[in-house]
């Protein structure tokens, strides 16, 4: 198919999908018939012709006024079939693309596809795991017989190798249904969500949710499927597991921030402390702590004894790691791009086993590799990365010394790696299996060389309650609150605000309203933030935190009278805080209540005599009230202690108003050492003119300063 035909097919597909979304079935059928003709899809063209004729007859009977109680049900069937045919034609179009990874892989499997059907695809045929994976991923929508055969196969008892093959099959079904919706595969995933095997159940549940996020609009057309989902939600343990999945999906939103934080924030801090020591920017948290310990550096404090940024990073990332966040994306990114092993899609989803045909035989008996795989919280593809990396290193590097150090770093026992993998229990909890699989899926979607051929669910809205029927199944206030708190911890402010907003207002706590207000602040919704803080204050009066947020918002909005009320209450709760006294003074100055402002400023100066902030404010207040000699006295103190450009500018005003224009010019020039601005007096023109200077005086002073 050439580019012109490809563009036409894509245009017709988009037109058909839009018509279906707009409930214009006849227009959709016309576009689909055009697609079928272009793609030379004879069977689809014939069915579309029959469907169009049947719909014409239905419309004809309706126009004649004929009573037909089944008319609406028939119309829904026509719509569903039109959606299914649009998917079938979309797949045909993809296969006709000469350069697409989907089509290229499909053509490579041609010998295996001879006489192929879904029933013959069952693993008894003796195909390799990779061939099975590709055949399933590339499979057409299942027929009823194929769906039944696969459903039976998944419920057959199996040993470990058969279980791994079944897990691969579930992942392949997931990728297939994500790309081209197939209700039969979706139903299989629903049934497998009740599997007693943890690995299989995790993959089925993740697959079900990913397919649903992408194709929720299709699912609603299948009442039997919606009913199954509702029954599934009532199954024992399902809601707890779906909540764990939701939390893990939220954590994936942090992966990029963690990767950037480790490389751009934490590592520069460590490098600064390590000075001469060389560090690799892909070190893990424990390795960073070890390096700091070796250098006799305390990560909690700076050299002057103040809390360090590094301590904050370590605590934040350690908490994220404990909750199951992906801390190793950056570490394994280069490895996965280096080994041909990861150019094969199936290998990203292959449950870890030393019996994988591409893993060196001696890796299984290497105690260091065994210890790493057991002790570190790694997804399956990361474990394969370790095995492949180890196979390239000299034997002495992976010996007992390294094993002992790794055991100490992971807080484990080095003897755990001495027994072969097969003799150790491999059962994982649902949460562990879920973390591993979601992280592995995330890596595939972001690192696989042909990732553009697959739909990336992590780019979608990850909150399940935004999609029917989960919007009616996951509406409990406690669930929404827990999810909102998780999003808040992850600094996903917009998501957290949306979740808090969905909660029943009467059931929200003061703390949740506080967090809702903070999220609204972070996303620029100032009015929403004010409303949330006011509600929190009414539910829990005299909260210092709430009052500070409210006061800051009122102040930033220029409502200084309301801000003043908040600061006065704060001052009564914490009378010894210099910052509160300064804020009180600021509000009083804006309200032209200068006598009160001076009282607050003298108190701030008494509470914090070493700070120049009260001096600056006192100088400015004296300037505003015409007490220029006192203003000058305080500006001299300010100028003696690391003055800012604003300090030099305001001190220039004081000198000029005291009748010392020479000193004023020098100070003005120091306020603008790099680039002189001819408008530097504009902001304070009213103050200067109120003191008796004319517009001409300001113009001449501007020229005197700028013409050096």
Predicted regions and their residues:
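TPR alpha-solenoid repeat register
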Residues: 479, 512, 546, 580, ...
């Amino acid at each position: 198919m050439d580019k012109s035909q490809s563009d036409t097919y894509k245009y017709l597909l988009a037109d058909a999908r839009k018509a279906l979304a707009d409930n214009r079935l006849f227009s959709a059928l016309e576009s689909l018939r055009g697609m079928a003709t272009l793609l030379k899809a004879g069977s689809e063209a014939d069915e579309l012709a029959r469907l169009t004729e049947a719909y014409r007859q239905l419309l004809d009977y309706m126009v004649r006024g004929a009573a037909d109680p089944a008319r609406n049900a028939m119309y829904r069937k026509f719509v569903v079939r039109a959606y299914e045919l649009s998917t079938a034609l979309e797949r045909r179009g993809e296969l006709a693309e000469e350069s697409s990874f989907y089509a290229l892989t499909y053509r490579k499997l041609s010998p295996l596809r001879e006489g192929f059907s879904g029933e013959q695809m069952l693993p008894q045929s003796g195909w390799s795991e990779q061939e099975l994976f590709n055949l399933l991923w590339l499979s057409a929508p299942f027929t009823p017989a194929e769906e039944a055969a696969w459903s039976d196969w998944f419920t057959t008892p199996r040993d470990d190798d058969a279980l791994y093959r079944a897990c691969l099959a579930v992942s392949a079904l997931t990728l297939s249904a994500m790309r081209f919706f197939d209700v039969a595969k979706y139903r299989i995933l629903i049934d497998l969500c009740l599997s007693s095997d943890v690995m299989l159940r995790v993959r089925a549940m993740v697959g079900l949710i990913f397919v649903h996020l992408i194709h929720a609009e299709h699912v609603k057309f299948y009442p039997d499927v919606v009913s199954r989902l509702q029954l599934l939600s009532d199954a024992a343990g399902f809601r707890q597991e779906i909540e764990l999945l939701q939390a893990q999906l939220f954590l994936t939103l942090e992966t990029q921030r963690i990767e950037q934080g480790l490389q751009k924030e934490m590592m520069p801090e460590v490098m600064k402390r390590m000075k001469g020591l060389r560090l690799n920017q892909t070190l893990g948290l424990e390795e960073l702590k070890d390096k700091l310990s070796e250098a006799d550096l305390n990560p909690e404090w700076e050299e002057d004894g103040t809390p360090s940024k590094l301590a904050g990073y370590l605590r934040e990332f350690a908490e994220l790691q404990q909750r199951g966040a992906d801390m190793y994306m950056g570490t394994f990114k280069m490895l996965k791009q280096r080994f041909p092993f990861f150019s094969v899609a199936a290998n990203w989803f292959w449950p870890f086993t030393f019996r994988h045909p591409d893993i060196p035989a001696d890796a299984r008996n290497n105690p260091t590799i065994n210890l790493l795989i057991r002790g570190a919280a790694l997804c399956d593809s990361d474990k394969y990365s370790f095995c492949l990396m180890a196979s390239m290193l000299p034997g002495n590097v992976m010996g007992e010394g390294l094993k002992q150090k790794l055991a100490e770093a992971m807080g484990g026992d080095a003897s755990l790696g001495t027994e072969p993998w097969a003799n150790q229990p491999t059962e994982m909890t649902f949460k562990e299996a879920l973390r591993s699989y979601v992280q592995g899926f995330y890596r595939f979607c972001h690192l696989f060389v042909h990732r553009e051929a697959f739909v990336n669910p992590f780019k979608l809205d990850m909150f399940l309650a935004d999609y029917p029927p989960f919007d009616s199944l996951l509406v409990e206030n406690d669930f929404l609150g827990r999810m909102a708190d998780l999003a808040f911890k992850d600094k996903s402010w917009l998501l957290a605000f949306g979740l808090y907003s969905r909660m029943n207002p009467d059931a929200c706590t003061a703390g949740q309203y506080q967090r809702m207000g903070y999220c609204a602040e972070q996303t620029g919704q100032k009015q929403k933030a004010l409303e949330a803080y006011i509600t929190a204050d009414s539910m829990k009066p005299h909260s210092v935190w709430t009052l500070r947020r409210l006061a800051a918002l009122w102040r930033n909005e220029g409502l200084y009278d309301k801000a003043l009320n908040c600061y006065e209450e704060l001052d009564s709760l914490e009378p010894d805080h210099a910052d509160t006294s300064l804020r009180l003074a600021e509000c009083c100055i804006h309200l032209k209540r200068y006598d009160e402002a001076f009282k607050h400023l003298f108190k701030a100066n008494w509470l914090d005599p070493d700070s120049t902030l009260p001096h600056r404010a006192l100088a400015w207040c004296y300037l505003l009230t015409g007490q220029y000699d006192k203003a000058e006295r305080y500006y001299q103190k300010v100028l003696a202690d690391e003055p800012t450009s604003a300090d030099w500018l305001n001190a220039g005003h004081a000198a000029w108003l005291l009748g010392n224009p020479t000193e004023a010019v020098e100070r003005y020039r120091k306020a603008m050492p790099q680039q002189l601005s001819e408008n530097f007096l504009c902001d304070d023109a009213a103050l200067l003119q109120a003191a008796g200077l004319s517009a001409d005086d300001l113009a001449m002073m501007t020229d005197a300063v700028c013409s050096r």
